[in-house]
Amino acid sequence: KVVCACKDFTANGKILYDFCSIKNTILDSEHGGTGTELSDIMESMEKQQFVNPNTLKQHFWNMFVVDAFLGNFDRHNGNWGFLFDSATQNAEIAPVFDCGSCLLPQADDKVMERVLQDEDELNARIFQFPTSAVKDQGRKIHYYDFLMSKKSEDCNKALMRIVPRIHMDEIQNFLQEVPYLSDLQHTFYQTYIQ
């Protein structure tokens, strides 16, 4: 199986505190830190004291928009958070990590072929699923519907920040150069991301 490794950003004495552990100390809810209700996440971001709440909200919505673009169905409270430097007693937002649930990772050759041959199958994987792990009023958010609804001004601003930074030609070139992928996988990922 092809995997991707990233640099260890907890080196040099930095400690990762995932948002789940922070949220758990802030809100008294039945799901504790693991609950992904959008309103609870927003409230926790306001109440946490690691970084400026507005900066954190901006990061969250930027990450949400990119997750929507990549079809990440698993951005829960345990895979984003803060880095705390015990030497300086300073905290910063951790780099984005754990994106293993992007780009339909369970799609085998049969699924890829079906999606490439049937526009309805492709559209279903863009407009219907995957959904976000974040919930709104108890239901997982459908990325497309949420982004098109413009119901969150902060999300709308993130769209305006992120979309101009997406350079499809560079992404397509990157995907084409990924080693170990079959021709089918190259075609599938390039089609899906487009």
Where are these regions (language model features)?
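Conserved protein-kinase catalytic-loop segment immediately C-terminal to the catalytic Asp
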Residues: 76, 81-84
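ATP-dependent phospho-/nucleotidyl transfer catalytic cores
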Residues: 9-65, 69, 87, 149, ...
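Catalytic-loop of the protein kinase fold
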Residues: 67, 72, 77
